[in-house]
């Protein structure tokens, strides 16, 4: 007799696309809306009051449209929150103001020239708010009558639609009947019809028809029957970037390239025509230019040609605010033999407003690590948090933040509810920080492969000769 096979189902909760990144705990700059005074700890940011206030002032001018074509450099040692401040600015700007973030190394590509990549980044950071008025028919469908020809000719029909104040009958042609069938419009639906394009939008079911069926799908939405006139004029606002307009006009079916990302190089003639057209729309009051923000991280990785291009691009009529971050002191400018502060050419530094970030204090490191643990849904014991703070001070903040997760995994293995000091100590012994790694390399330098590929296998690990008796 066969033994029955038993199966045990195991389910794991996955986060999907909502993963925890290094700066996912940041919600804004954490400043007062009226006075722009930074709070000690707010919206995920801790400390760096001067840098945050400077960023808030820049942000305020961006929102008011009073500043464009300026360059700001956030300079400071590693692990002092330069990228975090930029992320806070992006969160505070909202979805309407374009914010483009890229690393300097992304500029260098075999498929695209450096100037084209920078041009596209600049154009992505400039928004165009286009206003258009359209006539819309909005109401509740009372009845749909469709007359189909016996010989297979054109279909004709009538649409009875109403608001709380009036009711009207419209004649429908073949295309409108097909659109109604496609959207599955029936009596009792509240719909919106754009007269210029013929687009039908199903807003939901009327509350008056809520008892028509005993069971309905989860996606069924009930709305009130519209009031007033059936035909109303609405102003619709679209916000697009100049780069999106460039891509759409650069080729036939260019809008498909927006989804595939294969934009390629766009000719300067196309951009000039778009600039002229946008300027016309602006004069006619149809469009409004929104200067956004372009953030370039690790800006010292750009070469002298890129800096020369940015110098010229900042003087153009359509230019965003360029915010850069660098952790270099005196460094060589890429593409030259010259050394300059922050790795930027001196003529470019003249045009830059510099915001400095300072190393975090012990208390600020403790608050940041506590926020990170809360974001990752990890409970830390007070002793574990104190040890992590000490590690953050003696090593760096990134390393201390990284071993929070590994300590949590070790605590889960022993079925603990919170991370203890023993878990942090075990993680510290398992994973090296940069200082201990350098010490290890120096101790075993002869056993590592050198620049020329040479390695000394006979060198003892502890420096003493091996004895075999």
Curated annotation (Swiss-Prot):
Cellular compartments annotated: Nucleus
Residues the record lists as binding ATP: 76-83
EC assignment: 3.6.4.12
GO molecular function, one term: ATP binding
UniProt entry tagged with the keyword Iron-sulfur: no
InterPro entries, alphabetized: AAA+_ATPase, P-loop_NTPase, RuvB-like, RuvB-like_C, RuvBL1/2_DNA/RNA_bd_dom, TIP49_P-loop
UniProt keyword Iron-sulfur, yes or no: no
A cellular component term, taken from the record's GO annotations: R2TP complex
Catalysed reaction, written as an equation: ATP + H2O = ADP + phosphate + H(+)
Primary residence: nucleus
SMART domains assigned: AAA
GO BP terms, alphabetized: box C/D snoRNP assembly; chromatin remodeling; DNA repair; regulation of transcription by RNA polymerase II; rRNA processing
Pfam families: TIP49, TIP49_C
Keywords: Activator, ATP-binding, Chromatin regulator, DNA damage, DNA repair, Helicase, Hydrolase, Nucleotide-binding, Nucleus, rRNA processing, Transcription, Transcription regulation
Function: DNA helicase which participates in several chromatin remodeling complexes, including the SWR1 and the INO80 complexes. The SWR1 complex mediates the ATP-dependent exchange of histone H2A for the H2A variant HZT1 leading to transcriptional regulation of selected genes by chromatin remodeling. The INO80 complex remodels chromatin by shifting nucleosomes and is involved in DNA repair. Also involved in pre-rRNA processing.
Subunit comment: May form heterododecamers with RVB1. Component of the SWR1 chromatin remodeling complex, the INO80 chromatin remodeling complex, and of the R2TP complex.
Protein family (similarity comment): Belongs to the RuvB family.
Protein's UniProt name: RuvB-like helicase 2
Gene: rvb2
């Amino acid at each position: 007799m066969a033994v029955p096979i038993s199966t045990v189902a195991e389910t794991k909760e996955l986060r999907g696309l909502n993963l925890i990144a290094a700066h996912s705990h940041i919600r804004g700059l954490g400043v007062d809306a009226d006075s722009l005074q930074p709070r000690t700890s707010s919206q995920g940011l801790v400390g760096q009051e001067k840098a945050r206030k400077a960023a808030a002032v820049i942000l305020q001018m961006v929102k008011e449209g009073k500043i464009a074509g300026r360059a700001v450099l956030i300079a400071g040692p590693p692990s002092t929150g330069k990228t975090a401040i930029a992320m806070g600015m992006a969160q505070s700007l909202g979805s309407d103001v374009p914010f483009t973030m890229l690393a300097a190394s992304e500029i260098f590509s075999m498929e695209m020239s450096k100037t084209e990549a920078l041009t596209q980044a600049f154009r992505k950071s400039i928004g165009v708010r286009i206003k258009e008025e359209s006539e819309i028919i909005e109401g509740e469908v009372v009845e749909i009558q469709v007359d189909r020809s016996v010989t297979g000719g054109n279909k004709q029909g009538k649409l009875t639609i109403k608001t709380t104040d009036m009711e009207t009958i419209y004649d429908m042609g073949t295309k409108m009947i097909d659109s109604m069938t496609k959207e599955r419009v029936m009596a009792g639906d509240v719909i919106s019809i754009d007269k210029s394009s013929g687009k039908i939008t199903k807003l939901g079911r009327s509350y008056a028809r809520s008892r028509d069926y005993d069971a309905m799908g989860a996606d069924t939405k009930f709305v009130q029957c519209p009031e007033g006139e059936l035909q109303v004029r609405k102003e619709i606002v679209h916000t697009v970037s100049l780069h999106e307009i460039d891509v759409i006009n650069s080729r036939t079916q260019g809008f498909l390239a927006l989804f595939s990302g294969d934009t390629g190089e766009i000719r300067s003639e196309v951009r000039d025509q778009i600039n002229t057209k946008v300027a016309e729309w602006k004069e006619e009051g149809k469009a409004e230019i929104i200067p956004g923000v372009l953030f370039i991280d690790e800006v010292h990785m750009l070469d002298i040609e890129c800096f020369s291009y940015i110098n010229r691009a900042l003087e153009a009529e359509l230019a965003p605010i360029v915010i850069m971050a660098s952790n270099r002191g005196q460094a060589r400018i890429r593409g030259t033999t010259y050394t300059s502060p922050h790795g930027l050419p001196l003529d470019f530094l003249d045009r830059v407003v510099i915001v400095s970030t300072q190393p975090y204090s012990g208390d600020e490191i403790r608050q940041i690590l506590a926020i990170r643990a809360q974001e990752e849904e990890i409970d830390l014991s007070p002793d574990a948090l104190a040890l992590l703070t000490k590690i953050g001070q003696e090593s760096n903040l990134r390393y201390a933040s990284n071993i929070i997760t590994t300590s949590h995994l070790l605590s889960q293995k022993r079925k603990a509810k919170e991370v203890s000091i023993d878990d942090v100590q075990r993680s510290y012994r398992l994973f090296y920080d940069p200082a201990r790694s350098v010490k290890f390399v120096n101790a075993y330098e002869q056993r590592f492969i050198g620049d020329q590929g040479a390695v000394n296998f006979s060198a003892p690990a502890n420096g003493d000769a091996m004895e075999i008796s």
